[in-house]
């Protein structure tokens, strides 16, 4: 043991704490020079934290029908330990030189501010809510699977800081005695504002948007109720829109696409956004040098649903068709994969719902 007292301080040695950590000497060296921070872990391998989070709100009734409010709130996700903590990257070149899987992904914290309005207008026929918000995230936790460069196991790390800001609006309108309209819309702007040094050239650059955060999404619904044959009948229809977004915080899409081509002889067919710069240190098979720092694009999607129903006494029945146009609406899931995999919306689905109340 090159570091006297380490075995005693950490209850039998670093090897017992960092299973799968590779070279014991390398792990000890990383602890000594500060690349692996174990200050939050006690001799039993337990991480404990104490803190206070705040939530405060203030509202003001402008009239009987309109209220405005403000909210300040804080949140957090607790720290998490990595089972392959202390493992040096298998690739010790370029941006990976000296990289070590962290012992702990630190607690990430959130500060949120909201200003909004809740209202009932048009003699109670219209309910309208609007809220604007801004959120700051410090030490954002992310998971990563990078077997080509770091380790075969998924691990957690703190990528840096981020900001989000947006506006949400929802409404319900009694357009007539029979017709009800409802809907919601959300505008979202996100940005990665700081990147930890060890992730430069691995994560997407500062200024990039956060993954799976479409700038615009919304829905609108209509329902028409009427009496028929001694019971209650209705028609309903809905449209749901989800704007385009990107997947993942690591800029590994071009690298994964190259792996896809070598493994299966074909591309995934999913669009890629170049975020600027290059990713990693392994050149692509096309002979064009390092792959670009890039992410997969999840295209926007619009789905439509319709239904017709009837209820009488204790029985109700509804015939429905969801996703009429069989919109694919795929979302790429890059985490924990060598090649891109996608989840998709359920295709056009028709069915009959029956219920009985007693």
Language model region names:
Residues 1-63, 100:
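Signature of Gram-negative outer-membrane beta-barrel scaffolds
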Residues 44-52, 106-109, 159-165, 210-216, ...:
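Short sequence motifs at beta-strands and strand-loop junctions characteristic
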Residues 50, 58-61, 74, 107, ...:
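Residue-level signature of outer-membrane beta-barrel architecture
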Residues 52-58, 101, 111-115, 165-169, ...:
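Hydrophobic, lipid-facing positions within transmembrane beta-strands of outer-membrane proteins
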Residues 61-77, 83-85, 95, 104-167, ...:
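Membrane-embedded beta-barrel scaffold of Gram-negative outer-membrane proteins
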Residues 72-78, 87, 121, 132-138, ...:
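Transmembrane beta-strands of outer-membrane beta-barrel pores
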Residues 127, 132-136, 155-251, 353-357:
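Gram-negative outer-membrane beta-barrel transporters
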Residues 239-265, 279-280, 309-358:
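C-terminal beta-signal and adjacent terminal beta-strands/loops
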